[in-house]
Design a protein with these regions (language model features):
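Bacterial N-terminal signal peptides
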Residues: 7-16
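Alpha-helical bundle segments that constitute or directly flank the non-heme di-iron/ferroxidase center
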Residues: 70, 83-91, 223-224
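Extended intrinsically disordered, low-complexity coil regions enriched in Ser, Thr, Gly, Ala
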Residues: 74-75, 90-113, 117, 126-140, ...
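Sec/Tat signal peptide C-region and signal peptidase I cleavage site
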Residues: 17-21
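Positively charged n-region of N-terminal signal peptides that target proteins for export
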Residues: 1-6
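Short, glycine/charged-rich beta-strand-loop motifs at protein surfaces that mediate ligand recognition
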Residues: 206, 219-224, 237
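Short, structured motif recognition centered on aromatic/hydrophobic residues
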Residues: 77-86, 115-116, 212-221, 250-254
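Acidic, glycine/proline-rich low-complexity segments that act as flexible tails and inter-domain linkers
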Residues: 22-76, 128-210, 232, 239, ...
């Protein structure tokens, strides 16, 4: 009985401390919030720009003092969202800073690497390799040996089978059915290529949860402005455990990096798309 009373008291203390911290954050100014988040991300005090101080202040207060406080996302997930956005856009100097930030807030090197790898089916190998090069540079600067641990879970023999199982779980056989109108060999090669390249080679890998992979894929497609594919991935996110609040939070997190138009387009689609009214994108 004493033990349970002790545990209950401990929980009450922790809850009270957490509530006090939340209340304190609510009372902070945007500048104070920006200072706090910036130091957590970059392990340095926030500083201005000697050439464009006003612009830098707008940027920092919006991203670190405002956007970071919208929605229920962990700092780890926020930085992975930023990493895949910057990878997709090939903004490599900023990518390097945010790879460091992603590691500083508690992501493992493997989680960051796998987030970058995940972009390959969407943006192609050349741009992904550019981002991998930046990642490896950061890892070397931190004194971590390369290569990192292998995360593959498939063999050549079960590659297609494993990828197809994941694809069907989230998306059914929509693409396969849509490609039936193509002449051979394309009616099978195109749909099989999608299965093997995206789901077999990358979705089956360890390092990230399926829930994380789906959310990051939605961010990548939004960054690309691939509106046709986005409704299917909204449904995929719902099936993977990312409710609409989580998807909306990811879009808000991406706004300062990818801009308002693409993010707002996906936000509108999240609002409208439901499992019961979803229509296949390829018909």
């Amino acid at each position: 009985m004493k033990f349970f009373k002790y545990v209950l008291a401990l929980h009450l203390i922790l809850f009270s401390t957490f509530a006090q911290a939340q209340e304190k954050e609510k009372q902070m100014t945007r500048e104070e919030r920006a200072d706090k988040v910036y130091e957590e991300l970059f392990a340095a005090k926030r500083s201005g720009s000697p050439t464009d101080p006003e612009f830098m202040e707008i940027l920092q207060r919006l991203i670190f003092g405002e956007v970071f406080y919208v929605g229920e996302l962990s700092p780890q997930d926020r930085e992975l969202i930023t990493v895949v956005s910057l990878t997709t856009m090939q903004t490599l100097p900023q990518l390097k800073a945010h790879i460091n930030a992603a590691l500083n807030v508690g992501n493992t090197p493997l989680q960051v690497r796998e987030s970058i790898y995940l972009a390959a089916p969407f943006i192609g190998f050349p741009r992904t390799l550019n981002a991998v090069g930046v990642f490896n540079e950061v890892i070397k600067e931190r004194g971590i040996n390369l290569p990192l641990e292998n995360m593959a879970t498939i063999t050549e023999e079960n590659r297609f089978e494993k990828g197809l199982a994941l694809q069907k779980e989230l998306y059914g056989d929509e693409v396969k059915q849509a490609m039936q109108a193509l002449p051979e060999p394309y009616q099978t090669e195109v749909s099989d290529m999608l299965t093997k390249f995206c789901f077999s080679d990358f979705y089956t890998r360890n390092g990230l949860t399926l829930q994380q992979k789906e959310l990051l894929s939605l961010v990548i497609l939004t960054t690309l402005g691939a509106e046709k594919q986005i409704p299917a991935h909204i449904i995929g996110n719902l099936k993977a455990g990312n409710d609409k609040n989580r998807q909306l939070a990811a879009m808000v997190q991406a706004i300062p990096y990818i801009g308002l138009p693409n993010a707002l387009a996906t936000i509108n689609l999240i609002k409208e798309t439901k499992i019961e009214n979803y229509k296949p994108i390829y018909e």
